[in-house]
């Protein structure tokens, strides 16, 4: 037996038609894609309304606003972060870093005064 049976031919024809329809459905119409409307925040709404009138001073005010936001976020905030880190984590000034003082033993010399710590007295009758 050679060739396809009538059922197989019908199935192949239906699959080809389904594939043609699917490919045709993938083509976008001129009005697609439909994008959802953008939600604007309160500041963006304000600036859009403010800039509707195209006067030069309004554009200058908006430019100054944009530059000040840039300076605040890219200069001041990083400088504050670096200052905080340097002040509380790196500096050796008094109270900059609080750390535990090292132990002092008999015979040690105190650097600031040059004083030598005397040996401890022995108390033979007390048991600690």
Curated annotation (Swiss-Prot):
Name of the protein: NADH dehydrogenase [ubiquinone] 1 beta subcomplex subunit 6
One example GO MF annotation: NADH dehydrogenase (ubiquinone) activity
Stretches that traverse the bilayer: 68-86
Major place of residence: mitochondrion
Domain of life: Eukaryota
GO terms, biological process: aerobic respiration; mitochondrial ATP synthesis coupled electron transport; mitochondrial electron transport, NADH to ubiquinone; proton motive force-driven mitochondrial ATP synthesis
Modified residues (N6-acetyllysine): 24
Cited function: Accessory subunit of the mitochondrial membrane respiratory chain NADH dehydrogenase (Complex I), that is believed not to be involved in catalysis. Complex I functions in the transfer of electrons from NADH to the respiratory chain. The immediate electron acceptor for the enzyme is believed to be ubiquinone.
Gene Ontology CC entries for this record: mitochondrial inner membrane; mitochondrial membrane; mitochondrion; nucleoplasm; respiratory chain complex I
Family: Belongs to the complex I NDUFB6 subunit family.
């Amino acid at each position: 037996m050679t060739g396809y049976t009538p059922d197989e031919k019908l199935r192949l024809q239906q699959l080809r038609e389904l594939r043609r329809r699917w490919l045709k459905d993938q083509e976008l119409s001129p009005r697609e894609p439909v994008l959802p409307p953008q939600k604007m925040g309160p500041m963006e709404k304000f600036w859009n309304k403010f800039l509707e009138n195209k006067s030069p001073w309004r554009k200058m005010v908006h430019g100054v606003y944009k530059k000040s936001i840039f300076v605040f976020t890219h200069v001041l905030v990083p400088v504050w972060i670096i200052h905080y880190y340097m002040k509380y984590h790196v500096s050796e000034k008094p109270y900059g870093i609080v750390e535990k003082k090292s132990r002092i033993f008999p015979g040690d010399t105190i650097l600031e005064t040059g004083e030598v710590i005397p040996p401890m007295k022995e108390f033979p009758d007390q048991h600690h």
